[in-house]
Swiss-Prot record:
<dbReference type="InterPro" id="IPR009906">
    <property type="entry name" value="D-Glu_cyclase"/>
</dbReference>
<dbReference type="GO" id="GO:0016829">
    <property type="term" value="F:lyase activity"/>
</dbReference>
<dbReference type="InterPro" id="IPR016938">
    <property type="entry name" value="UPF0317"/>
</dbReference>
<comment type="similarity">
    <text>Belongs to the D-glutamate cyclase family.</text>
</comment>
<protein>
    <recommendedName>
        <fullName>Putative hydro-lyase Bcen2424_3550</fullName>
        <ecNumber>4.2.1.-</ecNumber>
    </recommendedName>
</protein>
<keyword id="KW-0456">Lyase</keyword>
<dbReference type="Pfam" id="PF07286">
    <property type="entry name" value="D-Glu_cyclase"/>
</dbReference>
<dbReference type="InterPro" id="IPR038021">
    <property type="entry name" value="Putative_hydro-lyase"/>
</dbReference>
């Protein structure tokens, strides 16, 4: 299935699940959507936190398309599920933004680690959340983001359990893709990140960690959602964690070496 066909299946309601493992060679994007009055500060926030918030594209006020991401793309309908935040609280989860869209909304598309998973799979590195048919586990850490204006919050990380040799290879592979979070930020003891229980992720689903495996943590594009909550905007919208926007950008084009 092409990215365009995948987006159309989402648009007509045929697909509503997590997007990991779909359209493997193509990049997926996290979303943050907020009123134009706050967009400049949020842009500075992304620039100050590039590991967690690598920008793939920024829309014009009111625009629900970003041409660089896909020709027939519609931000309002092409994500399987959206989180709606009001005054810093998650108030609803919706499948379309048609009824909520405003002329002053600015869209930020942020790189997603699902994009490099195809490269890991090609190297024979198994991905537990794909094997178990669930969402990748994501955790809020104790690490504060670099603040920009009203935006702060805590770093969120995704976790994939890997054997030692695979973890080393994963560092080598993902280092080539800083536009989709790049290399892991930590391998091993989750308490170093302020994570007490790997079986209780704040976002996504817990996965099995087998004997001899290490938890490997990447900066995650859900991080902006902690910043949106921290800022307590009157309204802000994001993808539901794990439910990404499929783009026409190839993963190979994001490699820096």
């Amino acid at each position: 299935m092409t990215p365009s066909e995948f987006r159309q299946s989402v648009r007509r309601g045929a697909f509503r699940g997590p997007t990991a493992g779909h359209c493997g060679p193509f990049a997926q994007a996290n979303l943050a959507i907020l009123p134009d009055a706050y967009a400049h500060d949020f842009l500075r926030f992304c620039q100050a936190n590039p590991k967690a918030c690598p920008l793939l594209g920024v829309g014009e006020p009111g625009a629900f398309r970003i041409d660089a991401l896909g020709d027939d793309l519609d931000i309002r309908t092409d994500v399987p599920s959206y989180n709606v935040y009001r005054d810093g609280r998650l108030t609803e989860r919706v499948e379309s933004l048609d009824a909520l869209w405003r002329d002053d909304f600015v869209v930020f598309a942020i790189g997603c680690s699902f994009s490099f998973e195809d490269m890991l799979a090609r190297e024979g590195i198994g991905l537990r959340h794909v094997e178990e048919g669930c969402n990748v586990p994501m955790y809020r850490t104790s690490i504060a983001n670099r603040r920009a204006g009203i935006f702060g919050g805590q770093l969120v990380v995704s976790m994939r359990p890997l054997r030692g040799a695979d973890a080393i290879r994963a560092v080598q592979i993902t280092s080539r893709f800083p536009g989709v979070h790049g290399a892991p930020i930590h391998i091993g003891d989750p308490r170093a990140l302020g994570i007490e229980d790997l079986n209780a992720p704040e976002f996504g689903d817990a996965v099995t960690i087998r004997d001899g495996e290490l938890p490997v943590f990447w900066a995650c594009g859900v991080t902006p959602q902690t910043a949106l909550m921290d800022a307590k905007l009157p309204i802000a919208i994001a993808h539901t964690p794990g439910h990404m926007l499929m783009t026409d950008i190839t993963n190979a084009s994001l490699a820096v070496f």
